[in-house]
């Protein structure tokens, strides 16, 4: 594992995780060339530090590179030219995540009326981009109607977020395989089922419908359920949630995260890999292959485990 900085023990209160994300593609015929690009490296921020990261690709690529996009996400590119029937991409990370400041949710802008978090009219606000609808549009009358009960006038922002997350959690059924990455928010509204990506996108559409700046967040969720409690959905899988922009002191802002899949606000169990306006900005992997293969199978496995000490092993 290549370290971004010296591997020291995490600070008090910080949670250290090891994340192993493995994707395997199997094809019915030989693939002569594979191009891939994805977002698999956890971000660095005030409360998250990617201590080390390694991306292993088998067969080994003839060309690979890493870059940073306009949102600050780390994008990895590779080109495999060796003929193959199986392609395996393994991302291995060590990440430190600190808990939110004690006053993030129970005080400050989170307790202000939700209308105060609208970036419109704030000088030089870069968050305005995150208020805009997508193409094709997601903000419809049906979305506005669904959002309305949560957005009562002058209601504290944190209450809006909790209520919206809770309503989506209650009103919709988590059903793996019920949607695809191209399923629209309004289709999810009609079907009343989906997966974490769908529920995050619905929450984002509701927030934007009311003039708030909201972003799509991809990453991982670490859970260690109490005795007798069910494990939360999202364990050992990629996860997605929503965040809303809030102005803090002059020149500063915070993203407040909400997870409608699990009916909770975001804390130190959430590991951020990418932020964007939608899933399409931060997919874990996408690519192009050259082959006569008629069939393919993809297997994805994710392990998120607490990590102690300062020794790393392959």
Could you say what each language-model-derived stretch is?
Residues 38-48, 53-56, 262-292, 296-299, ...:
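Glycine-rich, small/acidic residue-mixed loop/short-helix segments
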């Amino acid at each position: 594992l290549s370290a971004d900085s010296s591997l020291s023990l995490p600070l008090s209160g910080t949670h250290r995780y090891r994340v192993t994300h493995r994707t395997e593609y199997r094809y019915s015929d030989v693939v002569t060339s594979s191009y891939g690009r994805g977002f698999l490296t956890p971000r660095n921020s005030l409360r998250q530090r990617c201590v080390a990261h390694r991306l292993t690709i088998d067969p080994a690529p003839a060309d690979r590179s890493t870059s940073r996009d306009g949102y600050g996400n780390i994008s990895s590119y590779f080109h495999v030219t060796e003929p193959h029937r199986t392609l395996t991409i393994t991302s291995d990370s060590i990440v430190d995540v600190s808990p939110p400041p004690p006053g993030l949710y129970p005080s400050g802008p989170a307790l202000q009326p939700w209308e105060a978090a609208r970036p419109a009219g704030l000088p030089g606000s870069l968050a305005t981009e995150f208020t805009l609808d997508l193409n094709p549009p997601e903000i419809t009358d049906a979305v506005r109607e669904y959002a309305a009960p949560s957005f009562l006038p002058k209601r504290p922002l944190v209450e809006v977020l909790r209520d919206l997350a809770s309503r989506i959690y209650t009103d919709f059924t988590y059903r793996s395989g019920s949607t695809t990455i191209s399923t629209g928010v309004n289709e999810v509204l009609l079907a009343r089922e989906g997966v974490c990506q769908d529920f995050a996108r619905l929450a984002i559409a509701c927030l934007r419908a009311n003039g708030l700046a909201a972003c799509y967040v991809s990453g991982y969720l670490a859970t260690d359920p109490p005795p007798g409690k069910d494990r939360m959905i999202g364990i050992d899988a990629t996860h997605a949630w929503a965040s809303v922009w809030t102005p803090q002191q002059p020149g500063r802002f915070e993203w407040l995260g909400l997870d409608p899949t699990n009916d909770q606000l975001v804390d130190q169990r959430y590991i951020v890999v990418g932020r964007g306006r939608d899933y399409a900005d931060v997919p874990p992997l996408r690519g192009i292959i050259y082959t006569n293969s008629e069939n393919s199978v993809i297997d994805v496995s994710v392990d998120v485990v607490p990590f102690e000490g300062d020794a790393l092993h392959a």
